[in-house]
C-alpha cells in the first residue's frame, strides 16, 4: 500500500499513537487532513496537543469537531462523577474509561469527511496489543467497519473504497515509541493521560501503558 500523493484523513487525538500515524503518513508524502473531536472529554488538553502535532508536521488541514458525548456520559472520560481507574489494566474486563460508541462515531464522521474531499484513506492509531481492551480497537472491529464503509458510501459502491489504514494495529507500545522516535514525533508535545490535570497523572491505564513501554524502550536503547 502506497500513500505517496494520496489524501488521508487521520483521526488525530494528540496522543502517542495518532501522532505516530501522522508521522508515518507525512514520511510517506501523503496529503494529510487531521480530524480531532471535542467530545466533552475531561482531558481536553489533548486537543492542544493535536493542534501542535498538526502544525509540527505541516499537514494540509486540521479540524476540531464539536460533538458532546458528555450529554449522556457512560464513561469516566465524559462524566466527572465517575472515577478514572488507577489499579492497572484488568484482564478480560473493559474499564470505565471506554466511551460508548466513540470510535464508531469518530470513524463514521471521518468517513463522511473523507468522501466529501475524495480522500483515499482514513488513518487510525488503534492498537490491539498494549491497550485497555476496548472493543472498538480490535482487528475484527476494523475488518467489520471496513465492510460497512464499503457498503455505506458512494465510492464503496463504485468499487473505489476508502480504506481504513491501521499501521500500528499489530505493534506493541515499545515498537510504537521506536517508530515515533524514528519519525521525529515530539513526544513531549503529545498527551496520553486521561486526567484533566496540567501534568500527566502517571496512574491511569494510558499513563501506565505508555510509561512502562518508554522504560522498556529506554532500557533496550541503553543496552545497545
UniProtKB/Swiss-Prot annotation:
Cited SUPFAM superfamilies: Adenine nucleotide alpha hydrolases-like
Cofactor info, note text = Binds 1 zinc ion per subunit.
Top-level taxon:
Bacteria
Ordered alphabetically, the record's keywords are: ATP-binding, Ligase, Metal-binding, Nucleotide-binding, Queuosine biosynthesis, Zinc
Q: Name one GO molecular function term.
A: zinc ion binding
Cross-referenced InterPro entries: QueC, Rossmann-like_a/b/a_fold
Reactions the enzyme catalyzes? 7-carboxy-7-deazaguanine + NH4(+) + ATP = 7-cyano-7-deazaguanine + ADP + phosphate + H2O + H(+)
Annotated residues for binding of ATP? 12-22
- Please name the pathway: Purine metabolism; 7-cyano-7-deazaguanine biosynthesis
Q: Which Pfam families match?
A: QueC (PF06508)
User: At which positions is Zn(2+) bound?
Assistant: 193, 201, 204, 207
Annotated CDD domains: QueC-like (cd01995)
Question: What EC number is given for this enzyme?
Answer: 6.3.4.20
Co-factor requirement = Zn(2+)
Q: What class of enzyme is it?
A: ligase
GO biological-process terms attached to the record: queuosine biosynthetic process
Q: What does this protein do?
A: Catalyzes the ATP-dependent conversion of 7-carboxy-7-deazaguanine (CDG) to 7-cyano-7-deazaguanine (preQ(0)).
Q: Which family does it belong to?
A: Belongs to the QueC family.
The cross-references to NCBIfam families, in alphabetical order and at most eight, read: 7-cyano-7-deazaguanine synthase QueC (TIGR00364)
Q: What is this protein called?
A: 7-cyano-7-deazaguanine synthase
Q: Which organism is it from?
A: Prochlorococcus marinus (strain MIT 9312)
Q: What is the lineage of its organism?
A: Bacteria, Bacillati, Cyanobacteriota, Cyanophyceae, Synechococcales
Amino acid at each position: 500500500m502506497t500513500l505517496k500523493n494520496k489524501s488521508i484523513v487521520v483521526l488525530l487525538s494528540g496522543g502517542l499513537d495518532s501522532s505516530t500515524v501522522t508521522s508515518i503518513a507525512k514520511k510517506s508524502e501523503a496529503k494529510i487532513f487531521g480530524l480531532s473531536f471535542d467530545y466533552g472529554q475531561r482531558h481536553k488538553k489533548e486537543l492542544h496537543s493535536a493542534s501542535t502535532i498538526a502544525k509540527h508536521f505541516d499537514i494540509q488541514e486540521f479540524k476540531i469537531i464539536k460533538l458532546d458525548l458528555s450529554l449522556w456520559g457512560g464513561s469516566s472520560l465524559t462524566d466527572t462523577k465517575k472515577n478514572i481507574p488507577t489499579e492497572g489494566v484488568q484482564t478480560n474486563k473493559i474499564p470505565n474509561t471506554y466511551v460508548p460508541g466513540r470510535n464508531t462515531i469518530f470513524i463514521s464522521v471521518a468517513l463522511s469527511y473523507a468522501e466529501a474531499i475524495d480522500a483515499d484513506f482514513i488513518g487510525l492509531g488503534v492498537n490491539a496489543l498494549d491497550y485497555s481492551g476496548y472493543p472498538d480497537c480490535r482487528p475484527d472491529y476494523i475488518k467489520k467497519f471496513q465492510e460497512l464503509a464499503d457498503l455505506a458510501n458512494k465510492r464503496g459502491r463504485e468499487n473505489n473504497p476508502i480504506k481504513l489504514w491501521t499501521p500500528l494495529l499489530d505493534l506493541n507500545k515499545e515498537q510504537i515509541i521506536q517508530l515515533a522516535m524514528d519519525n521525529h514525533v515530539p513526544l513531549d508535545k503529545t498527551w496520553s493521560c486521561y486526567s484533566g490535570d496540567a501534568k500527566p497523572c502517571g496512574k491511569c491505564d494510558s499513563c501506565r501503558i505508555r510509561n512502562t513501554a518508554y522504560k522498556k524502550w529506554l532500557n533496550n536503547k541503553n543496552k545497545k
